């Protein structure tokens, strides 16, 4: 069954896609893994692979430094080290180090980006979890092996270091000694360089001076012109070097055996991690392929609806849309070379890629169905000479499909039951189609048979679809129209191919004379379908125009709102600027009053005139503010501005009728229409906080109660001066000072201050029932 499934996938070029995905793997073993993986057939398994691939893709696209190094295959060393007393080469151990290092880098990268919202990196961390035992193994291997130089590190094994030290010193002495011999006998040598033959230092002596240098002949050149002589003076040194080299090799093998044993003790963990890495690598390759092709994962559904699909192997391919709605059988008709086969292959290939977890190039609103198998019979290889053998081959393939298809299978037939007698082929096609409808399979077919077009009109769940074609160029535009069967355009194609016009005319006459009643009915149905399609297209265009007009009106309305807002903002700024300037005038007046330079009565008259203008401006500001803050949803903690006084504060209480605003040391009760939301930074004041209550009412004067009990005289007078300034600026003409009775010291200090202020009209103690001598009433 699997071999057959592989054959069907090959027919739609699925393995070419797999080859493209394989270019992005980090390990050669991943290529084999991808080749052996099968299409997934459950929603759970698909959603799992979608989440993995999407996560890796997002990490690649949004985070810098994603680890993606090439890793050599570990299949051989792992299989060898599964056996006891096995030993691997230093190259194999180097590959294990590189692999574990890469996994460690990936883990560190995932940990670094674990706080990114909407990215569940933990599922990757769990997949590539680096066990502490493997971390220890990595550290030990790195302690012994220099990965770059591919040799053992010095300073780890004393026996190895001792041999290495002696070899280096002896090599140096031999090289110096042989260089002296060369300098004394240069005329007899074919080369002034030291030659290394059979693991020995030698000299390249000319054959006619064979006896000039005493020593052993180690080798002779192929021409016989050069003798490679080992001088007697270095024979012992050469022998010693050979011995040391053998000892070094023995020690290296011993170290490698010990390291191999340590890997063997963790081989199960290593093998599991390596297999997990290969799976991860296959996911990563899919993710990178998706980035390169801008592919997506469409929604899993019970319905196959494809929008703006592109064949991934065709350059500049045109978008294909396939929307059969609830129909499970689609009969596609149209001219040869009209795009039927490309459409069928595209749908089959994208379905296979989707179920393999490979991102596909489709519109985001597309939905794909999960099939248990994808069966394909492509009729590409048709010719006069082998039509019978081709037909027999197709029948054999269709026989297998019919035996194994289920209600969850996708069955694709190209040029369904062609290559034989038309009447018999049509009958066979209808019979097979009825069988598949009874099974309730999902079927896509292309055909030229009129009987199948008529079949679609008379059976529920079966729909015609036609490939549109440019009749001038006779080129397909891959626009699939549902409910209307297509025409073959045989006569148009013949004319385009420059067949003699008289032949084409005669063919048309013959065709017209042979029309059956069914053909005529079918043609009438097609014409009616075309008329309905034209009406639908006209209505769609009108609907689009209406939507565009609605959008234009909406944009115009939004533009008007923006203009109105800009005008309001400009006016508000002007009014606020006026209020700001008026405030400055009032501040100057207060200062002059304190200094005694202006008559209070005259000043009040001036303020009265000014207030009329202020009220006019303020009303405009209030009106605009109310307009901009309609039914403001105030809440405790909101920062607001009191529009009549320009004071800023924070809401500390809300009742049905009033809102309490804390302004500095005062609590002000106002209505919601008299405040507006404001953004400002609160100033922190040092020292003790004292509460002051203001009952704000448009119809009455503001009355302030200032409580300075418990304050030192100096602090109280300084604080009182500031608050009296604020009272004057806000146009308040009466306020109360609670100083308490006690010994009367604070009261006397307050009264002395009031005497000095020329704008104070009078002050007196409160009524005994309202505090008596503990409270002073002040009038300005």
Curated annotation (Swiss-Prot):
Entry's EC annotation: 3.1.-.-, 3.6.4.-
Domain Smr: 706-780
Disulfide-bonded cysteines: none
Positions annotated to bind ATP: 334-341
Function per UniProt: Endonuclease that is involved in the suppression of homologous recombination and thus may have a key role in the control of bacterial genetic diversity.
Native source organism of the sequence: Borreliella burgdorferi (strain ATCC 35210 / DSM 4680 / CIP 102532 / B31)
UniProt GO molecular function: ATP binding; ATP hydrolysis activity; ATP-dependent DNA damage sensor activity; endonuclease activity; mismatched DNA binding; ribosomal large subunit binding; rRNA binding
GO biological-process terms attached to the record: mismatch repair; negative regulation of DNA recombination; rescue of stalled ribosome
Subunit structure: Homodimer. Binds to stalled ribosomes, contacting rRNA.
SUPFAM superfamilies reported for this sequence: DNA repair protein MutS, domain III (SSF48334), P-loop containing nucleoside triphosphate hydrolases (SSF52540), SMR domain-like (SSF160443)
Swiss-Prot/TrEMBL keywords: ATP-binding, DNA-binding, Endonuclease, Hydrolase, Nuclease, Nucleotide-binding, RNA-binding, rRNA-binding
Name of the protein this chain belongs to: Endonuclease MutS2
Superkingdom per UniProt: Bacteria
Taxonomy of the source species: Bacteria, Pseudomonadati, Spirochaetota, Spirochaetia, Spirochaetales
Keyword Magnesium in record: no
InterPro entries, per the entry: DNA_mismatch_repair_MutS_C, DNA_mismatch_repair_MutS_core, DNA_mismatch_repair_MutS_sf, MSSS, MutS, MutS2, P-loop_NTPase, Smr_dom
Similarity section: Belongs to the DNA mismatch repair MutS family. MutS2 subfamily.
One protein family per Pfam: Smr
